[in-house]
């Protein structure tokens, strides 16, 4: 949220914006999901059964796509997928409804409408003492990406 504010895409109190769901214009899904032998096989077992264990699931746009609400345990494998998306149809819908005008700077969003989006995906094994990344570190900064040439 703070990065979106720095770019001028969002404004106002970050906690209020997230609580209301304004951030979902740029990130309309959950942060990641459990993995089994295949990337999505755990959710195919039944998202509520695997990731919620009787806990209530949010109905808020964006948050309702979160696939895990149970505490992480050693041995779990989880993907973490932060990103940012500019979906023209969603921008038009929310802007037309004047949705979250206190939090979203739609004039600035228009400058990015044709960008598309980008997502970073990394997979982690939950251990007794924390988490271990599976695979190599993905380059994130412009300098790290340029160094791949």
Where are these regions (language model features)?
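Active-site neighborhoods and metal-handling regions in enzymes and metal-associated proteins
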Residues: 1-149
